[in-house]
Amino acid sequence: VGSEMCIRDRFISFDMEREIGKDILQVEGLTKTVDGVKVLDHVSFTVGRNDKIAFVGDNEIAVTTLFKILMGEEEPDEGFIKWGSTASVSYFPQDNSAFFNGCKLSILDWIRQYSKDETETYLRGFLGRMLFSGDDIFKNVDVLSGGEKVRCMFSRMMLFQSNVLILDRPTNHLDLESITAVNNGLSDFKGNVLFASHDYEIVQTVANRIIEIADKGCYDRQGTYEEYVLSLIHISEPTRRV
């Protein structure tokens, strides 16, 4: 099978159940200490319609902590967040172990618990996009490989049809064809995306805004990652990695 066929077979498409309004997210003065280290220090930004924001910086824990606060999984020490009334959010965590460890459900029954439509035909449609077909869907999720678990998480995310996607390094454990499918799906998505990734191509292709979580506050620039790096060079600041 040629690479083009492999890329086509892995089909990721994020649809929205409803359009998003003008006011999406306000983040004001977020401060958070983790294990004695201040990872967020008065971080403030707002998210507008059509924003696809890549969060970058040297401290991965800072971005993961920010995403957990946005999802209500952690509380900030200071500051607040306010989601718009029309925002519906799906979250792809960096650590998905809580979804699978000790779970004795089949892939089909695992995805069924997140769906309004529980029919096998409907659910097979979402699983099939991530190459779960035939008897694959009856495999227990607790024995899946890292890549298979990531594919399950993407099936779940597509199922929700949210208008805001938050993804924390979603391409870990994926092969090149699957990464390309993720890139295409996020690029084509009509809603908002807040994400972090080690994959340069996804950051460069998907993001139209870059927010770097700094030691104090954050740096916020419109444009691609390449434009962001060039702006840092222009003002003689050290180039920061994704």
Language-model features: locations:
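Short, flexible cytosolic linker that couples an ABC transmembrane/permease module to its adjacent nucleotide-binding
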Residues: E4, R8-R18
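Single conserved hydrophobic/aromatic residue that forms the stacking wall/gate
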Residues: V1-I7, I233-V242
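ABC ATP-binding cassette signature C-motif
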Residues: E17-S236, R240
